[in-house]
């Protein structure tokens, strides 16, 4: 549990960010903190304490407490704390540096990419100006050391002078994952060839030529990715190709409205039957959980596109594209289901545990969403919609889907935060830093017997996009970051039994055992002496 005492009062977002910062620190130290209560005291001269900008500081403080190490009190840090220990940007940077100087501090740690940042000043007419400043000028003005730190690892090093968590080995991809994803890619790319053959007699005009060229281009990318061994990327490209080929095939069939409705009915039945099969699967590992998430999401998405088909019957071209997409989404779901029942470290995945994980993740998103909306009130409507879907899943008891959608929504917000105030020519650096963190997380998860298939899949896809589309790569690296360490929300079914013993003070345990042995020995001696006295007494008689 987390207890927070503040003066003055604090807003909810600070309470949430404190809880999340604690979780990140516990994960960073690889310690199960579920048996400990954490008490934090925050005092300030401001009218109210708000925002998540103390997240990095709280994580450093919590880390030092857990590891029982001293840190340099002449150092200060500001920044949000995000999945994987990534330190995110904050507002009011100039004022914070000035405050650190007044307090006599020697070093200030700030988020990466803020060499030039902006201050937001609000006026009565809700107009704002962007006042830029150069941190090099502040360094000279105050003679204070200002250092950019991208991760919690780097911040801890600046506070302690020690490195505690570095990537030990290169990432080893699970052979089960590799074999299964390879088979998934083969299935989807083989379907591309099959669908392509269906349109051999296609009448080509300007419109269909564009569709055909796109389908062929995606299919070619799928084959190239497969030959390079990046099977998730291959499967993704072939899925896109399949949608285009299927759409072209449907166009040339000239289906009547009744025939379209009949196809919709058949597909709905197919979804229902397959969904029942999936519900019977037992979720034991992170791989199972993420497989279940992605399969259910695809089935739900297919169902939604079938709704769109029925709503757009008067627009033949639109409803046929939606029909093609729904069909391919179902096929994709069936392919992903092959990841269910993979081996790995087992966790306690009862409904209550997953519900709590979902609620925690929703709280994390809300905290960040409120913060970002202070600067971009109109630009996150899609994320808000995704979050609303997650809340609906929570209400309906679909906790796995809720966790999945909330994780993706959080990645959306974190992606905006990660480039907020970052110059365009620094985006590649931010992306590489995120990918590096994801890779390290994946290495550590693998060492723990966990292989997050979605985390790795998105990591692979982000790498394939980083040169051609760095902003999309940032988003997918965010998905990878969120979905590569879901285990921090769950307890290992085996670990609980081990921790039960580990939580006992070993010295007290040894003393207890020694006491029991001495007690038994004393009883034996007493009993022996008693018998001896009895024999002497009888001889005297």
Label every model-predicted segment.
Residues 250, 258-363, 367-370, 374, ...:
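Long, low-complexity or tandemly repetitive, helically biased scaffold regions used
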Residues 219, 226-227, 233, 306, ...:
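Hydrophobic/aromatic side-chain positions at a characteristic register within alpha-helices
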Residues 497-513:
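Juxtamembrane/start-of-transmembrane alpha-helix segments at the extracytoplasmic/lumenal side
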Residues 1-223, 252, 268-296, 300-303, ...:
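Peripheral, non-AAA+ core regions of ATP-driven protein-machinery
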Residues 231-232, 238, 316, 323, ...:
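TPR-repeat structural position
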Residues 330-334, 397-501:
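Membrane-proximal extracellular "stem/stalk" segments
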Residues 515-531:
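Alpha-helical transmembrane segments
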Residues 530-541:
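Cytoplasmic C-terminal tails of single-pass
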């Amino acid at each position: 549990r987390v207890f927070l005492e503040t003066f003055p009062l604090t807003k909810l977002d600070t309470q949430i960010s404190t809880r999340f910062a604690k979780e990140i620190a516990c994960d960073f130290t690889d310690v199960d903190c579920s048996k400990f209560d954490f008490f934090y005291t925050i005092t300030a001269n401001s009218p109210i304490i708000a925002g998540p900008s103390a997240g990095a500081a709280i994580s450093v403080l919590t880390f030092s407490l857990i590891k029982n190490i001293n840190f340099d009190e002449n150092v200060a840090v500001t920044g949000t704390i995000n999945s994987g220990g990534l330190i995110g940007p904050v507002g009011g940077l100039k004022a914070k540096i000035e405050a650190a100087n007044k307090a006599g501090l020697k070093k200030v740690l700030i988020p990466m990419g803020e060499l030039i940042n902006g201050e937001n000043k609000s006026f009565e007419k809700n107009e704002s100006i962007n006042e830029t400043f150069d941190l090099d000028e502040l360094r000279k003005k105050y003679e204070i050391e200002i250092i950019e730190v991208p991760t919690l690892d780097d911040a801890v090093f600046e506070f302690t002078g020690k490195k505690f968590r570095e990537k030990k080995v290169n990432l080893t991809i699970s052979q089960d994952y590799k074999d299964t994803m390879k088979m998934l890619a083969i299935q989807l790319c083989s379907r591309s060839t099959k669908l392509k053959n269906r349109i051999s007699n296609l009448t080509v005009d300007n419109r269909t030529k564009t569709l055909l060229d796109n389908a062929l281009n995606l299919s070619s990318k799928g084959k190239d990715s497969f030959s390079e061994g990046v099977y998730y990327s291959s499967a993704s490209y072939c899925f896109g190709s399949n949608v285009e080929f299927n759409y072209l095939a449907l166009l040339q069939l000239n289906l009547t409205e009744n025939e379209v409705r009949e196809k919709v009915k058949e597909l709905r039945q197919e979804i229902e039957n397959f969904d029942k099969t999936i519900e019977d699967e037992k979720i034991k590992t992170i791989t199972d959980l993420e497989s279940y998430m992605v399969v259910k999401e695809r089935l739900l998405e297919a169902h939604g596109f079938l709704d769109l088909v029925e709503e757009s019957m008067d627009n033949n071209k639109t409803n046929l594209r939606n029909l093609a997409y729904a069909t391919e989404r179902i096929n994709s779901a069936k392919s992903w289901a092959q990841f269910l029942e993979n081996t790995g470290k087992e966790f306690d995945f009862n409904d209550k545990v997953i519900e709590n994980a979902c609620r925690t993740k929703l709280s994390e998103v809300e905290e960040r969403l409120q913060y970002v909306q202070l600067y971009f009130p109109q630009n996150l409507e899609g994320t808000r919609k995704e979050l609303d879907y997650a809340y609906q899943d929570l209400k309906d008891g679909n906790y796995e889907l809720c966790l999945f959608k909330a994780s993706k929504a959080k990645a959306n917000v974190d992606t905006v935060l990660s480039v907020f105030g970052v110059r365009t020519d620094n985006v590649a650096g931010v992306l590489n830093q995120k990918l590096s963190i994801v890779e390290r997380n994946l290495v550590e998860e693998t060492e723990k017997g966990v292989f997050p298939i979605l985390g790795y899949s998105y990591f692979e896809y982000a790498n394939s996009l980083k040169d051609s589309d760095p902003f999309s790569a940032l988003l997918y690296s965010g998905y990878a970051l969120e979905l590569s360490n879901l285990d921090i929300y769950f307890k290992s079914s085996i670990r609980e039994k081990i921790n039960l013993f580990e939580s006992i003070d070993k010295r007290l345990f040894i003393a207890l055992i020694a006491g029991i042995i001495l007690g038994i020995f004393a009883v034996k001696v007493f009993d022996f002496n008693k018998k001896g006295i009895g024999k002497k007494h009888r001889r005297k008689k």
